[in-house]
A protein has these predicted regions:
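Recognition helix of helix-turn-helix/homeodomain-like DNA-binding domains
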Residues: 36-50
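DNA major-groove recognition helix of helix-turn-helix/homeodomain DNA-binding modules
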Residues: 53-71
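A short, Lys/Arg-rich alpha-helix, primarily the initiator
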Residues: 1-22
Length: 80
């Protein structure tokens, strides 16, 4: 089953990333190590901590009327 969420701000994006990571059973530390970034950076992303890049991105999206969606797969337990 696919879950699709409309992403309106950094917080929503962070929540989607966190949900997907948790469903995959991957810790913040594991994800950070795999990507070569700090665990703190993963935590900040999941918390929707604003940064210049994110603020600009969402300002441009809003001003131009562009919508952003995030989609991830969830195993449907009913199928088992």
């Amino acid at each position: 089953m696919k879950i699709t969420t409309k992403v309106k701000d950094p917080y929503t994006l962070g929540q989607v990333i966190q949900q997907s990571r948790m469903i995959l059973g991957v810790s913040q530390r594991e994800l950070a190590k795999e990507l070569g970034i700090s665990q703190k950076w993963v935590w900040e992303m999941e918390q929707g901590k604003p940064g210049i890049l994110m603020d600009r991105l969402f300002s441009i999206l809003k001003r131009t009327g562009v919508t952003l969606s995030a989609e991830f797969e969830v195993e449907d337990m009913r199928e088992k």
